[in-house]
């Protein structure tokens, strides 16, 4: 029974490797095709690149890692829905606080800079 379980990952691994090679070949074909068919219209080349990238994503999605990535994306989307987003009022208040603190810090640094310039001028006799 363990021998059967050991064979399944190897065949799956080989299939995944073949799928990743196919994905890479499709992406290289998109880049090379875009370069070689430079005389065609931009729309035709863009359509070709989009089709090849979509095909590459489709092939990659059938691999083990691709399926894991799809599950991760779905779970991430569900987590984003659970986030409690701030109201417009909270957003505006926070933005104004950040703006006020930035202005105060800018004025403080400007003042410190002015004092330092005068101290250096006094020390050097300029």
UniProtKB/Swiss-Prot annotation:
Q: What is its main location?
A: membrane
Kindly state which keywords UniProt assigns to this record, in alphabetical order: Cell inner membrane, Cell membrane, Membrane, Protein transport, Translocation, Transmembrane, Transmembrane helix, Transport
Recorded superkingdom: Bacteria
Which cellular compartments is it found in?
Cell inner membrane
* A Pfam family the protein falls into: SecE
Q: Name one GO biological process term.
A: intracellular protein transmembrane transport
Q: Where are the transmembrane segments?
A: 18-38, 40-60, 97-117
Indicate yes or no for the key word Lipoprotein.
Answer: no
What terms describe the molecular function in GO for this protein? protein transmembrane transporter activity
The record, for InterPro entries, names: SecE_bac, SecE_sf, Translocase_SecE/Sec61-g
* GO CC annotations on file: plasma membrane
Its record classes its membrane topology as: Multi-pass membrane protein
Protein's job? Essential subunit of the Sec protein translocation channel SecYEG. Clamps together the 2 halves of SecY. May contact the channel plug during translocation.
Q: Which PANTHER family match?
A: PROTEIN TRANSLOCASE SUBUNIT SECE
Q: What does the annotation say about its assembly with partners?
A: Component of the Sec protein translocase complex. Heterotrimer consisting of SecY, SecE and SecG subunits. The heterotrimers can form oligomers, although 1 heterotrimer is thought to be able to translocate proteins. Interacts with the ribosome. Interacts with SecDF, and other proteins may be involved. Interacts with SecA.
Instruction: Check the record and name the HAMAP family matching this protein.
Output: SecE
> Which family, according to UniProt?
Belongs to the SecE/SEC61-gamma family.
Indicate what this protein is called per its UniProt record.
Answer: Protein translocase subunit SecE
- Record organism: Vibrio cholerae serotype O1 (strain ATCC 39315 / El Tor Inaba N16961)
């Amino acid at each position: 029974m363990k021998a059967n379980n050991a064979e399944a990952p190897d065949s799956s691994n080989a299939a995944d490797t073949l799928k990743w090679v196919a994905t890479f070949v499709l992406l290289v074909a998109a880049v090379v095709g875009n370069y070689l068919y430079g005389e065609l219209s931009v729309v035709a080349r863009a359509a070709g690149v989009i089709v090849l990238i979509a095909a590459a994503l489709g092939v990659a999605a059938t691999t083990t890692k691709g399926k894991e990535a799809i599950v991760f994306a779905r779970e991430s989307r569900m987590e984003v829905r659970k986030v409690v987003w701030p109201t417009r009022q909270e957003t505006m208040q926070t933005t104004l606080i950040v703006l006020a603190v930035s202005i105060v810090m800018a004025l403080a640094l400007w003042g410190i800079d002015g004092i330092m310039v005068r101290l250096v001028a006094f020390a050097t006799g300029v």
